[in-house]
């Protein structure tokens, strides 16, 4: 059996409990894995500031793939140092947003950079803190997107009446050129630069470290985890994962509320 050298795990719905916290057991399992030579990488749709807060809560000092692969952080010294970004060209962003507006009139947007968040006022009005781990009043507002004063890594789109899963399916079926569409289970659809995913960022990290696909295990529960689940040598899903994602699992773990990822890491101990 090939030895696992790296575990990449999604956060919400996978590593985190339903209250969006990391259990003491999971924090200890990640640290024990690090000490035994198994690298743990976080792979999430979340932004830099939110990942930093989570890392501080549990003492995580590894690497984190953020914004569905568009941003990579190194938290080795406790600060969220950006080591890589993949941006969306402004022309591609404008064309993609126009396409989605045509497909679903009434859709509203926000543009996200490595550190910035710019939203249409109607987008901010639909948000709760948990949606982006920032209060709506903390968002920079702009009536005319795309509009951001740093390179754009992600576009988010939502509709006041159409569920995000339905909006995602409609956009995928119709096709939106120049961007990579995905859905994390949040109340919005996410777009990155074409070809960017958690898998693309993970593959680059592994190439630098000389880690083969077969030496990688990945845990995830949602559509945005599918690329890395199909890329890795071992696909893991918590039992609460979406049915279509569970179908990809080599191993089904206990649920996120039962510390499923921790149980897998504990099983890797020599």
What are these regions (language model features)?
Residues 24-126:
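Active-site phosphate-binding/coordination module
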Residues 103-219, 223-227:
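Conserved acidic, metal-coordinating active-site core of Asp-based
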Residues 33, 44, 68, 155, ...:
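Residue-level signal for inorganic ion chemistry
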Residues 35-41, 60-62, 154, 214-215, ...:
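Short active-site oxyanion
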């Amino acid at each position: 059996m090939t030895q696992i050298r790296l575990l990449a795990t999604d956060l919400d719905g996978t590593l985190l409990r339903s209250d969006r916290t990391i259990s003491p057991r999971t924090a200890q399992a990640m640290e024990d894995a690090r000490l035994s030579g198994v690298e743990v990488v976080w792979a999430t749709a979340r932004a830099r500031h939110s990942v930093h807060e989570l890392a501080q809560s549990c003492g995580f000092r590894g690497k984190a793939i953020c914004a569905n692969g568009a941003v990579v952080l190194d938290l080795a010294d406790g600060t969220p140092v950006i080591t890589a970004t993949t941006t969306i060209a402004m022309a591609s962003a404008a064309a993609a947003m126009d396409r989605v507006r045509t497909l679903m009139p009434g859709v509203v947007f926000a543009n996200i950079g490595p550190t910035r968040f710019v939203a249409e006022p109607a987008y901010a009005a639909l948000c709760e803190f948990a949606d982006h781990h920032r209060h709506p009043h903390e968002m920079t507002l702009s009536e005319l997107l795309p509009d951001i004063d740093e390179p754009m890594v992600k576009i988010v789109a939502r509709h006041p009446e159409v569920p995000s899963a339905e909006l995602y399916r409609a956009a995928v079926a119709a096709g939106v050129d120049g961007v990579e569409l995905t859905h994390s289970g949040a109340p919005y659809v996410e777009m990155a630069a074409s070809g960017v995913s958690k898998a693309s960022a993970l593959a680059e990290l592994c190439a630098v470290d000389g880690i083969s696909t077969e030496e990688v295990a990945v845990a995830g529960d949602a559509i945005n985890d599918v690329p890395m689940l199909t890329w890795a040598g071992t696909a893991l899903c918590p039992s609460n994962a979406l049915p279509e994602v569970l179908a990809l699992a080599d191993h089904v773990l206990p649920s996120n509320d039962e510390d499923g990822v921790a149980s897998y890491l504990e099983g890797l101990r020599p």
